[in-house]
A protein has these predicted regions:
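Conserved beta-strand-loop-alpha-helix junction that forms the acyl-donor binding cleft
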Residues: 20-23, 44
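Vicinal oxygen chelate
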Residues: 1-15, 37-83, 87-117, 126-129
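Conserved active-site tyrosine of GNAT-family acetyltransferases
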Residues: 26-31, 92, 119
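Alpha-helical macromolecular-interaction surfaces
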Residues: 24-25, 87
Length: 129
């Protein structure tokens, strides 16, 4: 990699995207269980793109996946800050969600990692205040 070239000037993170295979199943998880509200949605030829505005961040889910963009527990993790960690864990357990990392308390937060219906890792998080 060359080091004497102009730097890319990133101004913000536009969105984080998760590929999904079954859009209705994904919507049941993100909208029904997590309570996210759709900000933008479009469909073309049976392929969907849905965005959720969360604070100053956007999460996109899409079944417009390809060989290069597949669901994986090994990819990046979006961490959702929740109002009440214990209640969130109870709701996820009641919803039958698989926990990849069981709920734990650290010196700075409480957190757990769950799997969405396609196997993407999602963190539930609450900062100690």
């Amino acid at each position: 990699m060359k080091t004497n070239v102009p730097a890319v000037r990133i101004v913000e993170v536009a969105f984080t995207g998760y590929p999904v295979t079954d859009i209705e199943r994904a919507k049941a998880f993100y909208e029904g269980l997590l309570g996210l509200e759709v900000a933008v949605a479009f469909e073309h030829g049976g392929r969907h793109w849905i965005e959720y505005e969360i604070g100053g961040t956007t999460l996109a889910i899409s079944n417009m996946s390809s060989e290069q963009w597949k669901a994986s527990a090994d990819g990046p993790v979006m961490s959702f800050e929740v109002e009440n960690f214990e209640e969130a864990v109870e709701a996820l357990r009641a919803g039958g969600v698989k926990f990849l990392v069981e709920p734990m308390a650290t010196g700075v937060c409480s957190m757990a990692v769950v799997s969405d219906p396609d196997g993407n890792s999602v963190m539930i998080h609450r900062r100690n205040r």
